[in-house]
Structures are given as structure tokens and as C-alpha cells.
């Protein structure tokens, strides 16, 4: 093929390795809660350094609070779950943004893994960009016809494909 696109998400490092290329990934687990009532009409976002539960987003008849961020091992990425501790953290931090969350029913809890490109100076992963990363391996590694696209958030994966394929 004249061009191979590695869009393997959190498994992208393994695909790149098959081509003799090193892509250091940072598997960042994130959890969020969906509530059964829309309690805000605009996005509420804390003006602070990135942290857990710093955004409350309205949508139709619901709202969501999120997210958490923690590094997980590659052996855990296929089976991430929202923990009771994460629920407690999201609730306690979310109630600081909107006290009404204390009495709003949780409909669902979601967890996923962000396929972030690792940064040497950020072992926590909190300051790694959540933006889309396009690695041209001809420029970067001398391997023509091979690119890796990764990063982003679970909710933007379709935008990634639309913008770069």
C-alpha cells in the first residue's frame, strides 16, 4: 500500500513496533458519570490546572461530570471499569461545581482509555495534550508511507478519522 495509517488507539504502539518504529503511549484511564437530570444550561468548567471532575456538561435531558485521569497498565486496557472511589470523587468534586448533583440520580458510569502519546516530563499524564496527534514516520523515523494518528478523547474518535483520512 502507498500509505498505511496506524489508527490503533491505545494499541498503536504495538502496530508501530511491527514496522520497527517506537511510539511511546500513555494509557490514561478516564471515568465520567451521566446524571438523569439536566441541572445546567451551559458548560461549567473549572478555571484551574487540569484535575479530576473539572467539567459539567449539559445535554438534552441529562448532564455529565468528568473526567478522572489515571495511568493504567497495558494489561488492563481491555477491562477498565469505574471504581466506587472514582464515583465518590466525581460526586464530591461535582457538587462543588453544582450542589444539585448531590440529589440527582446517576444513570450511568463510563470508563475508557485515552491513547495519549507519552511525555518524558509528565509521569502523571495530567498535562499530556488530549489533542489529536499525527506522526509522519517518514519525517520522524525515515519510514515512508506510514503514519500514526492517536490522542484525542473517546468522544472525538470520529472527528479524528474524518479530519485525517
What is the meaning of each model-derived region?
Residues 1-3, 7:
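Core beta-strand elements of the Rossmann-like FAD/NAD(P) dinucleotide-binding domain
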